Amino acid sequence: YGARAANGVILITTKRGQASSKVKVSYSGSYTLQTPGIVPDYVDGYNWALMKNEVSTGTFSPEALQKLQDGSDPDHYANTNWLDAVLRNASMHQHHLSVSGGNENTRFMTSVAYSNQDGIMMKTGVERFSFRSNIDTRYKRFTFGLNLSGNKNNVTTPAVAPSGEGGIMRYVSWFTRPTVPVMYSNGHYGYVDGSSLSAELMKNPVESMSLGHRSNEYWRFNGKVFAGIDLWDGLKFQTSFAYAFDLNATKSYSPKSPARYDAEGNIRKAAGETNKEEDYWYRNATWTSENLLTYNKQFDKHNVNVLLGHSVIGSRFYKTTASIQGFPTENIYELDGGTINPGAKGNSEEYKLQSFFGRVNYGYDDRYLFEFNIRHDGSSRMPKANRYATFPSVSGGWVFSNEELMKDYKNFSLGKLRLSWGKLGNQEIGNYAYAATLGASGNYFFDQGGDKQAGMVQTSVPNEDIKWETTRSINVALDLGFFNNRIQTTFEWFDKKTSDILMQLAMPGIFLGSLNAPYQNVGAVRNRGWEWNVNYSDSKGDWVWNVGFNLSHVKNEILEMGGLEETISGQTINRIGNPIGAYFGYKAIGMYRTEADLQRTNSKGEVIKQNGVAPKLGDIMYADLNDDGNITADDRDIIGNPFPKYSYSFNLGASWKNFDLSTFWQGVGGIYRYSWETSTDIRGNLTERWLDRYSAGNVNASMPALGNTMNDSYSSFWLENSSYLRLKNLEFGYTFRQPGLAKMGVSSVRVYFAGSNLLTFTSLKNWDPEKTSGDARNDVHPNMRTYSFGLNIQF
């Protein structure tokens, strides 16, 4: 229920000690080997050079090609696998120690944990410390408690981001050539010839990762104190106050870029003159006050549970960034060591949310169930007139297996019909989205001398009419159980419609200039679908086993966009009646393989061109949707759905005596991802699928000819089926319970092997099908495959 996060609240109870139990101590630890998961298979240096010659004749002479084949001149004609150069196998170890216990009145639990993880990319890693301590006590009608937790993370990376725009993986995937060595025999890093690249893209990825550093220390502390009283039979009151503090300190140092040399030691690019230190601090304090009144009572066959509550959340954060350049030495990383171009900026924001809520549960004879929820939430992110909103929900259930007429069906264990309807709110936008915001500028001229003055300028358009987003949900479900619930199944149908979606849309007929468009409640989206679960568990002798399966389908549909029919963003489009982020491009209908294909005409008998140019053999053939005889941007349309047709998972588990085995499999079906690669001028790596490209001797190739910019256009040709089934987790263990352990104060010892992402079944080549963005290429940090060995001991 509720308005927070993604339209709801999840109630979490952390581990606590048990009453009337002796002190228990447990330790768990593991060692993990991490390896890169699915990564592209790029062509070697020789085949890359052949392809380069096809688009740029004479780039590599016959003598050069021979050297690439025999490896006789690795300085000038290398065969470098850049993924192997920047990725590695890495280790991780984790340790967790907990102590718990209690008596009739007091319970406690304390735990500490430590982990150290090396990244699979050079100079990356994470070190983490954490602790948790919970204690609660009861005195007559009163209860008191204290929860404390905290952690410290230290993340290290190179100064250049490992992935994303401008990151190392982007260089490897798009710009770095296999014919360039990582390092010359003279000790200098291999130089990427920049004749067709900007200076920014001429970087050697391994060299870039070796320069500078970036460290991020993140601290978090949580504390909560609570007290309660039993007022009378079934009526309780509890109050609590929680405080959370976050601190993030990041230091990033970029040294002067070194001179770049060729294999003969000649300078090809002079050394940079600027080094830079940039520090970033973020601190956030959040407090939460909550008061709950509950009543729980059983009257004969009637069960009543009532909750009334009030909560207030307040948060304030501060951000500061400072930078400076001109360090006389590369060994000083403090701001005071810089000499030129100092700069600093910062800001702070605050936010509050107040909620009044209630819930009534009623059950009759374990057959008829009813629940009613209501929330009244107010957010500082909304303008005063629309600050508060009310969100009700109601649900009912009928346990028909408890009806008298079902008693004769002995193998029918459970039958339950559930229905629910409700509204939830969402206010996850900026803290001041409804107001006009101001920004500083130093470019105002107020005198004839031309001196610039500092001032403030409006940066956004206000809208004091915005209100909460609202999601209306309808659920209908059927739960069934058979053979003493050894077989259980659930089928659920749902319809979720989100209205008044807050979007920033341009205002028709109004020129905003540099102003940000205002937020408006203009969107509506529906997600409708179903989910089916079935589980089977049983035992025989020393054997125990379980099987579970889940299958779901969701249809996403845009219903409204503030009067707009569509908005286009690159290779995706939002259009009424279609899913969010639908693929947008040309519809590929084949390839020009013969001279007859080149004479393809439209309905008027006109030979179809591509952007006014006659196509060539080996080009991708596109549909002329507007039938004008020329393939242009006007012929683009929706070519695919970014959402899967269905998602599924299943788990298999079994145990025999002291051995246990569990597996979890997960997959999706009917999903497509872009696997586009630029092939116009061949600036960087290409995958091995290009070995089967069109040529006069290979007219039935799967890939087009190299060198045509139209082939690089986003089209259905580059949409590949990315359905997959993956073994997400596997664990095999053995538990020692010998009597001799008890004499040493040990109750049990378990050793196990665990793995993740061990197997993947997919038709997609070279890219990880689980990558969730619209473009499937691995220019981001790859998923990892892990192998873990662990130990659990309980005293």
Model-inferred region functions:
Residues Y1-S20, I38-V43, N79-H96, E104, ...:
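Outer-membrane beta-barrel proteins
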Residues G8-V9, R16-K123, P158-P162, V182-S195, ...:
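Residues embedded in well-ordered regular secondary structure
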Residues V25, M209-G212, I340-F357, F445-Q488, ...:
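Outer-membrane beta-barrel signature, preferentially recognizing the C-terminal barrel domain
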Residues S26-P74, Q520, S539-P642, S763:
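Conserved small-residue
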Residues Y46-Y77, E165-E207, S252-N275, R316-A344, ...:
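Surface-exposed loop/turn segments flanking beta-strands in extracellular/periplasmic regions
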Residues D70-S72, L83, V206, A259-D262, ...:
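Extracytoplasmic gating/loop element in the C-terminal half of outer-membrane beta-barrel translocons
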Residues S72-S100, E104, P255, N266-R367, ...:
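Outer-membrane beta-barrel transmembrane domain signature of Gram-negative proteins
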Residues G119-R132, R138, N147-A159, Y218-R220, ...:
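Small-side-chain secondary-structure face that scaffolds active or pore-lining regions
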